[in-house]
């Protein structure tokens, strides 16, 4: 079922994924149960997000199964030309554009108007070069349920001293933060060499 959903994205949104970027886009580490996709940025489905780079995605097992604990549970990282410290407004505004564009691109029912996405975030912690955010994305599920859903979200924004840019890691799930789905999600992490140096050395 997951593969069917990925094919739908590929057809509907003209997602760019190429073997020549395979090494570059191996930005996240997760075990073999997680499916992977990569998307070129700017997004074809959300061109209003005006950055250049790549999105590296990991989908939990059962991402497309309504009855699975992994339903709509996934993570992605943006490796983009972003050199301004991100704020709650940045994430709220850009995730609205992202999900509105994605759901409208996937939607096949022209008789309905997709409701606008609502987002809310708070900055939770700042530790060295990592700033954490927590919040929600309320959006229309054009893939499976055809209903509004609320995704709980955490974001870790990493500052790379060598490249002088910020790299945000997003984790999403409709499950409560105490659910075991979040134990799985938190095991999806950035690779140590994502900043062309070791994450332990980021200051």
Stretch-by-stretch model annotation:
Residues 128-202:
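Short, well-structured beta-strand
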Residues 4-13:
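Sec-dependent N-terminal signal peptides
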Residues 62-142:
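Conserved polar/disulfide-associated segments of primarily extracytoplasmic proteins
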Residues 27, 60-65, 143, 155-156:
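Catalytic micro-motifs at enzyme active sites that drive phosphoryl/nucleotidyl and oxygen chemistry
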Residues 14, 48-50, 158-160:
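Short beta-strand micro-motifs enriched in acidic
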